[in-house]
Amino acid sequence: TFSVFMYRRALDQIEMSIAYPNLPVKVFGFLPGITTPGGASHQAINDIAVMRSLPNFIVFETGDATDVESVIPLANSVPGPVYIRMVRGALPRLFPASDKIKLDKARILTQGEDLVILSSGICTEEAMRAVEILNNRNISVNHFHVTTLKPFTDPEILYAIKNTKFGVITMENHTKIGGLGTCVAELIAEHCLNKKLKKIALNDTYLHGASKRYLMKKYSIDANALIAKVEELIGRKLYILNKDLASARIDTYFNEKQQEAL
């Protein structure tokens, strides 16, 4: 069902009838964040924060066709309850079908020492566009596509943050409170890492209803927003234009005109 109807209306049943007895129930929430035009009544902007707080639950988020195809067998392999934040409709295939989603293991999309960028869900496509241009400007990026929000203990992420030059940026289709940015902030604090963190996420507010593209721009969770945060971290302007981002070829598996209906 819609993510909002699942975690808002049935939270007591989920907590007492699934989480508390630690039952192997797999809960799917569709159309998260700004992926639905239905406005505040239909937009799940804080579902990760809520579901991460439930004992025993594992939390996944999908971002492309490969994630969607491979998350079900992965969820079934987990003995306890699982929440899957699921995109649907026309989806890009950003990763080859053989590159399946893994528990508590982010995909490493690019490697570099200047910045660490962690993106999730629909924001990864936007981040990939920006990272392509950044690499062309000699800014090296360690870019992770995060699909497990709980647990959040991937040692590759911790190592990258420890060794980055300028800092860390998170990018997500969720409120700034309790989502991917919070996961990373907790990781930095727990390991006493002296690293700057910039969050790209939805502000602590309810949203308008409109198209996904319009809302990503309006609420600053698109490629332009990522470039602006990079400029803040490195302390200089990059003069990257909209046409530069639009022309970025992000992956050989992506074809905007042949998105897959899943």
Question: What positions do the PLM features span?
Answer:
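Conserved thiamine diphosphate
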Residues: 1-116, 125, 141, 246-254, ...
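Thiamine diphosphate
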Residues: 34-36, 85-262
